[in-house]
Every structure is written in structure tokens, then in C-alpha cells.
Amino acid sequence: MAAKDVKFSGDARQRMLRGVDILADAVKVTLGPKGRNVVIERSFGAPRITKDGVTVAKEIELEDRFENMGAQMVREVASKTNDLAGDGTTTATVLAQAIVREGAKAVAAGMNPMDLKRGIDIAVAAVVKDIGKRAKAVASSAEVAQVGTISSNGDASIGKMIAQAMQKVGNDGVITVEENKSLETDVDIVEGMKFDRGYLSPYFVTNAEKMAAELDDAYILLHEKKLTGLQALLPVLEAVVKSGKPLLIVAEDVEGEALAALVVNRLRGGLKVAAVKAPGFGDRRKAMLEDIAILTSGQLISDELGMKLENVTLNMLGRAKKVLIDKENTTIVNGAGKKKDIEARVGQIRARIEETTSDYDREKLQERLAKLAGGVAVIRVGGATEIEVKEKKDRVEDALNATRAAVEEGIVPGGGTALLRARKAVGRINNDNSDVQAGINIVLKALEAPIRQIAENAGVEGSIVVGKILENKTETFGFDAQKEEYVDMVAKGIIDPAKVVRTALQDASSIAGLLVTTEAMVAELPKDEPPAMPAGGGGMGGMGGMGF
């Protein structure tokens, strides 16, 4: 076991704080409409330019192991917020830095870290409740567009596109973001179906960066039972190889010899193939396989119908223009199914929804209906260079996540205003324990951090902005950093999803609370690398005595 280096109390916290500051300072320059870009070196290809907080955070590794631990904890804040809300990662990082800084000062002044943590938790709970009360449901497509515009850094065309896509496929519809070959960014509504089953083996992946399998103009084999043996599969595999098209296999499961053969064929390049488990269970699985069959103009290979796998021909397989498979989901886009068949199936499902008395069954039938009738919206991001396209795609994905969050939990005034106004709720809390009260005050001060940073990135003094906003009693009054003026944020369309604001604060306080209560840090000592062997073969001279 390698020797360890251990740091305690003040020394540990100081090093950790240095790491937190390095990461947070790199991330927070991207906050707000006048946030700057960060350029990230790539080991190959052109550098990446981004304004996405979590992308910057994920790239940072520090040489000092103790500083790196602090940085990685804050990176976790950005990642967690991104996973839960899909946006707000920079806000979460700024909040975490503010709480850790003030917390470290309080601990250095001799306060009890556990009481401070309790105070932080009490204050955060009050803010979350306050944000919930302020949140207003998204009522119109215009509000969806406003959220998208703010999250994409003030790009109204992106906001409009997302609102248009959501209108077409519904709030629960599937919207994906792709890179466009041309200069234009456009939205395309495609008939399609998405279900929650990913690839059975990572060896099916065709796009290593996204860890996804992408099959164009694919055949689709739908099988009701498990596939274990290879023999029955061979005729259909040979027919598909001759056609030169990729193949998607959807079955109850694919394992053993069958899965091994598919993986080997995929790796050798003989057959572009992917296999996924069928969605659902029992009778519902069979119904969903039939839905896919109708959508792709294929046949479900079922023993009940007297069909044998070895007798399957190409015209019994479904067809789709594109199939996208990641670790958790499969999306079938532009199936070859006839419109009248799909409409008839949709009619059947609607009739069953009206007949059913079970809420659970109704919910599952509505899911199937959305998958069949909703379709998939694809936003294609274009640009003059690959770097520009990637930067814009980051912003489109942020905006899409933010609009989904807004539809889910409503909207609040943007630009850091909601958190600043929540100070009132925290200010009302009084605790007899002075250390717990100090923890509450840490959050009270941290709630100013996002709006200060937005103002500073716009070249304005943060404290003046905070003071001006707090002087005005109108709840929606805030600072428009784009135009550098004080306005009614909601009337101006500067709004944030309540879920993003709430998640950012909860994740930031959770990790910051752990950092504040840290008393010791343990890291491996760097190993001394042995000197490299000298080059050349001069050392072999002693072999002469061996009679060669």
C-alpha cells in the first residue's frame, strides 16, 4: 500500500479553498449575458471554446493533490446540477464558492463546523420554500421562448426554435440536438419513437465521443422471445450483410452465443449491428413491439403466429431512416410505416384509454400514444467552423434543458433576482445558537454572489447593483446586464426556471457544507519514478565469453 500524506485543520482547509477558488474563478467568468468564453486545449484537433460552466469544470485537474480534492468537490456541484436540472451549473459553482469561503472564515474564527452546517441547511430549506412560492407556471409558448433565449445567452432565435419544437411534439416529446452540415441552424420535426432501453453491449457504439450507436437507413428485427443461439439468426444476418445496411435487433434479451457473434461481427466490421432489450414487460412489452412494427412497417416475429426466426426474410424486417442508441435510450426516427396504419393504431390506443378504469394503465397507454403520435424534434445547429458549431450546440442544449425545467416547476425572475429576494425569508430566521445563526448568515451573504458576478462580468460594480435592487420593493425588479439598466425582469422576459435556481442552491450548499466540516485530508504521496534505462545496446559487450 502506498504511503499517504495527511493534512489537518487550517492547512487542509486552506489548500482545499485554493482548489475551490481556481476552479470557481475559471467557471464564473462565463456567468450572465456578458459572460466571457473559456478556451480549452484538446489533446488532438482544435481547442474548444465554451461558455458552459460544467464543460469548463470537467476539464480542470490540479497538480497539488489537496487543492485538486477541493476543485473536484466543486466540480461535483456543477455535474450534479447539470444532471438534475441541465442548466445553472455556473450559478451553483458561484454559490458553492461563496458558502465555502465564508464557512472557512467562520471555522477559522473558532465556530463549530457542525453547527454552521446545520445553519446552512436551515437557511437553504427556507430559500427553497420561498422559490417554490414565487414560481409561476409557464403559460405560453412566448414564455418558453424567453427561457430558451436567456439560457442560450440572449440568442432569441434559439429560444424561438425550442418553443416551436415543444409546441410540435408537446412538453413531454423528444427533442434532440445535432450538428448541421450547413451554416444554418434549423428545427426539423420527424416522426419517431423513443423508449428507455440502451445497447446491450458497449461494443455496439459507433460514436465514441457520445458513447452512442448511430445506425442510418437500418433494418429492424423485432423478436418476442430471448435470442441465445446463433444458428437460427444466421439466415437473417447473412441477408442483411448482403444488403449492406445496418441492423437493429429488438428482443426480450440477446445473450450467450448470439450476443458474442453480433459483437465479433460488429468489431470486425462485417456487419453494423446493435441489439437492445424490448421495452416494457409482459403483455405491455408485446404491445410496444407491435407499435414499433407498425411504425417501421415490419413484422413481430412471434411463436404464437407460427413464425420461426430461421424463416425470416428481409421484407419481414422493419425499416427506419435513423436509429440512435445510447446507454439508456433508443430512438427510432422516420420509420417506414404507412401513415394510415399508424393512425389506425393511434385510434385503437385512444379507444383503450377511454375504456380503461385503471390510472396506471391509462398512464402507460398515454405514454405509448405520445411515442407513436408525438414524433421527434431535431434541432440542427449550423456554423462556419466546427469550433463555432460546438460552442453553439452547448448553448442550445443548455437552453433546451432550462425550458424543460421551466415547464416542470415554473419560472422566477432571472438574473440572480430570485435568490436575492429570497434573503428576506432567510433574514426572518433567528436561532438561539450563535454558531447555527452564523451558518444562516453565511447563506444570507452567499445569495448575493450570483447577481454580483453577473454585474461584474458586465463591467459594473456588484455591490451598487445589489444595493439598488434591494432599495426597490417591487419583487420582480432587477438588473438587465445585457443593457445595463434596472427593469421589471418578468415583463422584460428575463426569467429563470425555478427548478434550476433551486437545484443550484441545494447542490452548492450540500457540497459546501461537507467542505466546511472537513478537518483532515488524506492523499497519496507522489511516487519517485525510477530513472529510465539508458538507450542503445552498448551494454551487451559481456556476451563474448559465450562462444557465439
Swiss-Prot record:
Location in or out of the cell: Cytoplasm
Keyword terms of this UniProt record: ATP-binding, Chaperone, Cytoplasm, Isomerase, Nucleotide-binding
Record-level GO BP terms: protein refolding
InterPro entries linked: Chaperonin_Cpn60_CS, Cpn60/GroEL, Cpn60/GroEL/TCP-1, GroEL-like_apical_dom_sf, GROEL-like_equatorial_sf, TCP-1-like_intermed_sf
An annotated Gene Ontology molecular function: ATP-dependent protein folding chaperone
Gene3D superfamilies: GroEL, GroEL-like equatorial domain, TCP-1-like chaperonin intermediate domain
PROSITE patterns according to UniProt: CHAPERONINS_CPN60
One GO cellular component term noted in the UniProt record for this chain: cytoplasm
Oligomer and partners: Forms a cylinder of 14 subunits composed of two heptameric rings stacked back-to-back. Interacts with the co-chaperonin GroES.
Family: Belongs to the chaperonin (HSP60) family.
Protein function: Together with its co-chaperonin GroES, plays an essential role in assisting protein folding. The GroEL-GroES system forms a nano-cage that allows encapsulation of the non-native substrate proteins and provides a physical environment optimized to promote and accelerate protein folding.
Official protein name in the record: Chaperonin GroEL 3
Organism: Nitrobacter winogradskyi (strain ATCC 25391 / DSM 10237 / CIP 104748 / NCIMB 11846 / Nb-255)
Encoding gene per record: groEL3
